[in-house]
A protein has these predicted regions:
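Hydrophobic alpha-helical segments, chiefly the membrane-spanning helices
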Residues: 1-345
Length: 345
């Protein structure tokens, strides 16, 4: 029971520190002209808490759990986060198809590395490069494109800080003439924001250590298979922040922020997150369940989500279907793989 309490406390601290880190980073970027969608991908899509936890787990020789959080987070972003956003606040959304193609194809980037397992530091370098290339493509397109919709980036800042933004902050400009697809984040006191970001980063490191200690105890006490635990329970504890960062923007009339969070989180998770875990923690062995179960589910859920977004309207039926598939993933994972101990011979 003590291990469970340690895990819950660590996960809660991870989410809290991640929110503060996002707020600090957005504040530092306050004087820049940046696309709101690009901001969402970079500042909410990059999962600092997940990275901190994954690195801590791999350093402590819990590579199976670390790999499980990679798959689990990516699957939960569509099966929980996007699903709840569609159910709670159906909305129209306009995301370029090229972004959706990259989003749908992103899980397939893992396939060659999984097939040639174990995963190594050199694989991590390639995965990091793929994420940088993705961000570079999105940034280049956003900075030179035009769109009739101009959204105030202050919304992202308030949401990232744990607050809410009034609906009137979201405004539309006439199609003619088109407005540039970037917004100015209001200038903040940069030194204070930098200090906040650094403090939150330290908190993430401490929280990740506490959480990994709790996970280690749970695995020993309850004999749960490592990748399974990382892909389900540990992931669910870390999903609260993403649910807020996706549902609230939809409800406030800024769906680009929520969808950007989902797209950024999935692409980051299967590339840079795994890459950083490998570079800092070393080699990870891949069990058969990854190729036969977790990866196919991730490919299916991501492709289906990309299709729903491509229709231009996230509907409740889309959310219910994604949520049902995620529940089925949990049920099958525990009933089929749940009895395999992490150190089983």
């Amino acid at each position: 029971m003590t291990s469970i309490l340690i895990f819950v406390a660590g996960a809660a601290l991870l989410v809290y520190c991640a929110e503060k880190l996002v707020a600090g980073l957005v504040g530092v970027a306050g004087s820049l002209h940046v696309s709101v969608f690009l901001l969402a991908i970079v500042f909410t899509g990059i999962e600092f808490d997940d990275v901190a936890l994954g690195v801590a787990l791999n350093v402590e020789n819990l590579g199976g759990v670390a790999l499980g959080t990679v798959f689990g987070t990516a699957i939960s972003m569509t099966g929980i986060v996007l699903a709840l956003a569609a159910i709670i606040s159906p909305t129209r959304v306009d995301i370029p198809r090229s972004y959706l193609v990259l989003f749908a194809a992103s899980p397939l980037m893992m396939l060659p590395f999984v097939l040639t397992a174990p995963l190594t530091a050199s694989d991590g370098v390639v995965l990091l490069f793929l994420f940088v290339a993705f961000i570079g493509y999105v940034a280049a397109r956003e900075l030179r494109s035009t769109t009739p919709v101009f959204r105030n980036a202050e919304i992202l800042e308030r949401i990232g800080a744990g607050g809410s933004a009034p609906a009137v902050d979201v405004v539309e400009r006439p199609v003619d003439p088109p407005a540039p697809a970037f917004a100015r984040v209001r200038a903040q006191a940069a030194p204070g924001r930098v200090g906040l970001a650094l403090l939150a980063l330290v908190g993430l490191i401490v929280a990740a250590t506490v959480t990994s200690t709790g996970i280690d105890g749970i695995l020993d006490e309850y004999s749960i298979q490592g990748t399974l635990f990382g892909a389900t329970i540990a992931t669910a504890a870390l999903a609260l922040e993403d649910i807020f960062l996706t549902v609230e923007p939809n409800r406030r009339g800024a769906p680009e922020i929520g969808v950007g969070n989902v797209i950024g989180s999935v692409v980051f998770g299967v590339t840079a997150k795994l890459g950083l875990i490998l570079l800092t923690g070393g080699t990870i062995d891949v069990d058969d369940h990854v190729l036969s179960w977790h990866l196919p589910v991730l490919v299916l859920m991501t492709a289906l989500s990309a299709y729903f977004v491509s229709t231009g309207h996230l509907r409740r039926r889309h959310g219910f279907l994604l949520l049902a598939l995620y529940v089925a993933y949990w049920v099958v994972s525990f009933t089929v793989f749940g009895q395999v101990p992490i150190d089983g011979d």
